[in-house]
Amino acid sequence: QQQPSEPAPESLCVTTVLTSEKTSILDIANLQGIGQREQQQDAFGISPADRYETDGILAVLCDGMGGMAEGQRIAVQTVSCLLNHFPFPKPQTKAVSELIFTCTRKIYQQFYGHGGCTLVAAWILGNQLHFWSVGDSDLFLLREHQLYALNTRQEFQKDLLLRSFQGAFPIEEAFSDPQAGALSQYIGKEEVTLDRTHIPLSLFPGDT
């Protein structure tokens, strides 16, 4: 298994898919920058490329939460958890969700809630994309010069907006709340809510 790297926040995973009837080419890049932090807390890993034809390929990105202790360790541990269980059963993607739930519970028990990370995992199998995400790390699809956000940021502000729409308080309070930018979901909580594909996304030549 390929081990995750341990370098810088605001990293970007770029996956380019070129397909035709006879060929399937996959390019993966990991671009990172430490920003204004003193320590890199990202982790990134991919499954073995030589098993792409049979098992597909899995790319995992985790961003340790800089405001909490042990963010880097948790990010590396989460990437390793998914890669060590790859290849996943096909097409039972529900098993992957259960794996992530198990992973976050173990991390919660290990660190007692004093740390966490975001997660984006993309599994390309043939010409189809499955993904799972927790937190606010983004997954984008670039298709024919148009950029599409595939996942939803899980931030506390969205919960506040829903409550304001239900009449709990004025909508202005959802934007002024000091916790608005905090994560509502992250790996390291005892229980998490996933954003994921329920139906795989078909990929086309030139998709990135």
Q: Where do the protein language model's features map onto the residues?
A:
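PP2C/PPM-type serine/threonine phosphatase catalytic domain
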Residues: 1-208
